[in-house]
Amino acid sequence: MAGLALSATTAHADEGMWTLYNLPQAVYEQMQAEGFTLPYGSLYSNPDAIKNAVVNFSGYCSGVVVSPDGLVFTNHHCGFEGIRSHSTVDHDYMLNGFFAKSFAEELPNENMFVSFMKEQKDITAHMEALRIHDWSNARQEEMIDSVANAMTDSIKKIDPTLHITVEPFYEGNKYYATTYQDFTDLRLVFTVPKSMGKFGGETDNWMWPRQTCDFSVFRIYADPKTNGPAAYSKDNVPYRPKHWAPVSMDGYKDGDFAMTVGYPGSTERYLSSYGIEEMRDAQNAPRAQVRGVKQAVMLRHMRASEAVRIKYDSKYAQSSNYWKNSIGMNKCIDSVGIVQMKRDYEAKIKHYQDSTGFLKGRLNIKHLGDLYANRHKDMKDMLLFNETFRRTNELTSRAINFAQGLIAVKNPKAKAEKQYAMFDDNSDTWDADLDREVMAALLKNYAEHVDKADLPEFYNDINTKWGGDYQKFTDYLWNNSILMKKKAKIFVNSDKVKNDPAVKYGEQLLTVMKNLHKKLAESIDEIDEQERLLCEAKVRMEQDMPHYSDANFTMRLSYGQVGGYLLDGKPSGYYTTAESIVEKMKRGKENFEYEAEPIMQELMSASDFGPYTDKTTGKMQLCFLTNNDITGGNSGSPIFDGKGQLIGLAFDGNWDSLSGDIWFDSKLARCIGVDVRYMVYLMDRWGHADRLLEEMGVVKVKKGF
């Protein structure tokens, strides 16, 4: 047990999400032994370093530059909101796909960007000189922001297009400063139809075998004079990157070296056994339950209306992804016995502490368990509140935002009685019938899972005035609140607004939310400090071994091999083929998530795939498995071979990897990637995107077919 527990955060075999600027030499040498052929400097420091081709995609995914004119590959689900924003019932790019036949046809996107990491360095000594650990969490965050702002101000004097963030690593035992350059003129160039980009939908999400062609293509535009970042302008030109990833058509075989570089969002592998119990019981379980209720309503409305589907496809996908993740993670926690493994390992740390005196009087693992036990109910109630009331329907979102004062007064210099606020018209992003039904269903569900004494005041009205009918209460608010009137002036100081039913509803929700935050604040600082010390003790106990920090949406490298695993006791295989997607397409009438257009069925049923056929297997390969260490945020991460060439994009993990955020098991956890040859095949044979193929340097493949 202890040996297994050790692998939770100490690097064994190919485990780890490594920062590139200080990659341990031992890790690099292991990469070489497994097939990486490039010099150490090719990862971070050289002008043509791999880091210069990898981007943070819009703050939630990863991507890779693949051409000298700034083409970016990312996942279809990462670009999905951009695709949705351009879609209408008449021009449904989500459903039917899109290809810009010229630069002029490439579509700009609001609120999307790519960010290049320019530099990273350790500033722990500076933060410790500020005695950062002497302060509360809230004060620590203020100090981190202050340092980052000061560093940004300094670097902007040298280059105004740069900014710096400061992040804690190793549970706050280290601090790194990272310099970024953001490009905000990002345009949609190519996307496959939803039938292929989301093939298998929720049925296949987190599952293997997989056939999804999960990719989309964007282009970075830059200032024509400086090649630097610029706000959108028709005068901007394609960005000329320092380095781009060469696209490989050579494929891979079982055991080949594979490396991901991207932006994993969050892991908690140093988390205590008590923290894992809380995650399982007070977070994952209620999250899955509430989202199940919400998603059932959403899906029914989406299936009934194309217009509603366009509005909610992205919202549904985001919700259902972590609904299924929560279910799978809990099953893995229990089936693997992770809590007990962690408990056994904590006993080992306690023995080390007792024998050495390290952190004596500071780290108290038993006390940490008591702290978690005392806040369990409040944490679960907070999760239920957030899943029920935060961003689940338009009225509740507006009510809470208004109560928090987040809607700016339009005329602050006017007399108090004349001051008004106004909500932006976002009616193209929501549907009243769907939102009303979701709101009523979640109100009812919340009452069934929270103690009566902890419910907001308006539940008394639901029972006394509305006879317990949640839909009638919901409809009353929607029909009678000024918050839902399009372009209405909301005179914030008027008695009418103060007595508005949805305004009161929002204020009562805010009261509950503040009370929950207050309760949780009583223990959060002490819990976080004990978790930090637990991490410090672990690293000290294993100081002769390399350690990687938990993911925090900074660039990380993971290396491993192409290969399958045992799935239900049988070999899983390490790739899928065109034949397998055709078999699923035949079941489209039984499961709408396997439906595909006739042209896609024809393309995937071809008798000869020409140069897209794998030379080793003789098959057209679609998706493949590696044991790279990934998590959310790695979506769109390039998968490189040992020569630094692009062989695919990471887009998912398997069901058995769902405890990977807290525990990595290289025998079970797998990264699912979409084969770049599959991507190029559809760009070629479906999209006829010759100009993009030539731009990426795969024109010879096109002509050879």
Model-derived regions: residue spans:
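Terminal presequence/propeptide segments associated with secretion/organelle targeting
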Residues: 8-705
